[in-house]
Amino acid sequence: MSELAKFFIEVAEKWQRRWAEAKVFEPSPQPGRPKFFITAAYPYPNGTIHIGHGRTYLVADVMARFRRHLGYNVLFPMAFHYTGTPILTIAEVIAAGDKAVIEEYKEIYGVSDDDIKKMGDPLYLAQYFHRRSKEAMIKFGLGIDWSREFTTIDPEYQRFIQWQFEKLRKRGLIVRGRHPVGWCPRHQMPVGAHDTKDDKEPEIGQWTLIYFVDGEGLVYPTATLRPETVPGVTNIWINPDAEYVVAEFEGRKMVLSKDAAYRLSFQGNVKVIREARGREFVGRRVLNPVTGEWVPVYEAKFVDPKVGTGVVMSVPAHAPYDYAALRDMGEVKLIPLIRVEGYGEYPAKEVVERMGIKSQTDPALEEATREVYSAEYTRGVVREDVVDRIAPHLPEPARSMVRAVFKLYFAGRPVKEAREFISKWLAEAGLGGVMYDIMNKPVYCRCGTEIVVKVLEDQWFINYGERGWKQLARQLVEEMAIIPQEAKAQFLATIDWLDKRACARTRGLGTPLPWSQGWVIESLSDSTIYMAFYTVIKKIRALGLRPEQLTEEFWDYVFLGQGSAAEVAKRIGVDPAALEEIRREFDYWYPLDSRNSGKDLIPNHLTFFIFNHVAIFPREKWPRQIVANGWVLREGEKMSKSKRNVLPLDKAVALYGPDPLRATLAIAAEVEQDLDFRDAEARRNSQQLMSIYNLVQRLAQSAVEREETWLDKWLISEVAHVLERAREAYEKVRLRQAAVELLYNAEAVFSQYLSMVDKPSKSAVEAAKAWVVALEPIVPHFAEELWQILGGEGFAATAPWPKLSPDPAALLAKRYVDMLIEDVKNIPAYKAGAKRVAIYVNGNYQWLRAAVGKDVKAAIEAGAPPQLAKRLVDFAKSMGEEVRGLVERVEQFDEYAALQSYKRYVEKALGVPVDIYKADDPQAPDLGGKKKAALPLKPGIFIEVG
């Protein structure tokens, strides 16, 4: 631990104790006072939280602290998510003696051998990392109300979740049936993002299978995402070196890759008859079920047996990879199917040639494929003459009937419509089927097993596909604030594709499904409305309510206002006044004002949060805002356990100290951006905080009581502007912008001020107090220490947001002096070696005001001599926009007094003595005839060369 880190940790521990003693972050309802209720995603205690979690919690903490300064009654609570399989899986792996995982936990998290031995018990593991993570949050300086802490296996919480699920079931939003889910073959259970390594959500996609058949009746089920192109198939691809099987599936003998047969076995009954190499099937001919054409089976080593069925159809007119491969073989046959504006008959050929692709191994084929597929899907229309290729092998009248259907629903239709039609038609005609797959494979369970798709029977699902529910969810997304704004489109897209989702499992920690024994509600389903539970758990415990008293009637009254307090209280055996008190607590804090999480939770948790709120709560209790921050990298790389570069939050605090760490996580990127955490940046911010500390100490120790000068007024004005910009940044959750203003720009202003004055004034101390209050949300312990040094009363954390008024005249004086210094430095005589500088001030400021934005006549009418009027107007035009604006606002300005006030600053900047004269003073020497050259804010300058 460095000396700097030690200093910041000691400061932090002092103020953490004082906050806890004063219960600064434990609010109670205050009717009439505005409230701000913010939550961030509670963590899984299957490991210690890391700096990625720290960033999410920091954003929420900064928002909470800022609102407290604005006078809000702020609630920021925290809990721990024990539900699901992550904790159970890790405990099992450790109990089994998995050396890699054990070393990982010892190296990354610093777990002792004694604790490792006990972690075979899932509850011990959870409680260990719960404790470590909570300690890390406290050390990090999060202003959390720990009096409302709970875990998701607490009996009170389980009663709450059972109430939620009964509500969903009674509204028809929980169903039982057949549906594809991500599945761990080892644990024999559905999985979601929180059950997988790196929290990777298994993305389930659907292949259309098209049954090509050889002369022996063997089916070659091509798996495709583009079934509308089947009329243009010229051949089939099979990998000659891959392992295939002949297997029975859905009553047919099929050729499948061995891997595909394994994956399909979770979706239906697969019986492997024999194994074979792919080359056995190369050279055969198969019948296209749509066109009746016999097409060859070619070998292609680019076919991945782990994708689809390992059997691929080739459409060279519309697939760049197919075109390039067949061109290499000299076997190109092109059949046009889709018209796209801006492309010719054969889009794949056209794009391959335009991009200069020479072979089937060219990496540019990926880009070519994206271009063609995107253009055809978004703008493509199936050609009308495709009908002539349909079913020529069928006898009449079947041929005419099929062609009539294709003419109506396929030919001339947009690709999207044609795709939906032909997929359905193939299945209904028995010429195709469906295969589900993990489209973002490989995805691994935390136990190390690769996830597959299983079609479950009699599984419990939350039906996120229900249309009316989707519409309510869209309505909330459109109404609420979402930061960043561009994430709104991702929420709407997620709402569109969400369908049934498995909501219960047969193993793991959590809440039992209330109406079906043996099922446990899974982790992404019991974590959608728990924000409401924060508002009441403290009172439930304080009043000594038992879990069995927390009935459906209890929750209906507390959260929905249904029933009367007297009747409900009588039935559950509590005091009606106590019940009303709990209801008032919820009613005061809800709705949630901001929900904070990482952007990776948009496709699951955050969208489920929206769905469940609109399903259960009345409109006035719907959440108001979501903030989704970017990821955290470390030294340019994604953090992962395999790379051993995960930085636990408690280790980071020990390494840098909490406030330098907070400053770095705030300043390194705006909330919507991914943040690259770098050691050098953290150390630089640590040094910057020490510079601020030394500056404030110097200011506090040397300040004197005296009349305010131009310099004091300038300082206050600059700080007022910094605070104004910082406040706007905080309000927009632009933490980087706020941190730059407060950690660097403000420090530069104070440093310059101290360099300009002999002794700082007491008004400068008041300006520093204002700065410290604005700093507090980002570096709270450090701010408290500075607040104490400056003589602030109470806590900086609870001080109101400062009100400083900028003085335009003081700002004008400083800008004027800086312009003067620049003018002198640009004079050749000064560059040649100045010995002394004489400055002649024209005090007729009103002439310049009249000239700003006006003409010569206006300047003359204001009293300017005709011989100076044009120069005045030209000078007014040359002034920067800021100075021009200040001149328009400042009615009276004593240029001579301002310059005298800044004399020391000017002499220091120029490095020579400076004499200041009034241009109209007859007693003043007219060196070089510079009196008459003086204009308001542009004095005459004489330089004595040594």
UniProtKB/Swiss-Prot annotation:
Example GO biological process term?
leucyl-tRNA aminoacylation
User: Which residues are involved in binding ATP?
Assistant: K641
What is the residue range of the motif 'HIGH' region?
43-53
- Record localization: Cytoplasm
Which InterPro entries does the record associate with it?
aa-tRNA-synth_I_CS, aa-tRNA-synth_Ia, Leu-tRNA-lgase_arc, Leu-tRNA-synth_Ia_arc/euk, M/V/L/I-tRNA-synth_anticd-bd, Rossmann-like_a/b/a_fold, tRNAsynth_Ia_anticodon-bd, Val/Leu/Ile-tRNA-synth_edit
Which is one GO molecular function term here?
ATP binding
* EC number assigned by the record: 6.1.1.4
Primary location recorded for the protein, binned into one broad class = cytoplasm
Q: EC top class, in one word?
A: ligase
Is Nuclease included in the keywords of this UniProt record? no
Where's the motif 'KMSKS' region? 638-642
Q: Name one GO cellular component term.
A: cytoplasm
Reactions the enzyme catalyzes: tRNA(Leu) + L-leucine + ATP = L-leucyl-tRNA(Leu) + AMP + diphosphate
**Keywords for this entry?**
Aminoacyl-tRNA synthetase, ATP-binding, Cytoplasm, Ligase, Nucleotide-binding, Protein biosynthesis
NCBIfam families tied to this protein: leuS_arch, PRK12300.1
Give the family, as the similarity comment puts it: Belongs to the class-I aminoacyl-tRNA synthetase family.
**What is the name attached to this protein's record?**
Leucine--tRNA ligase
Give the gene symbol.
leuS
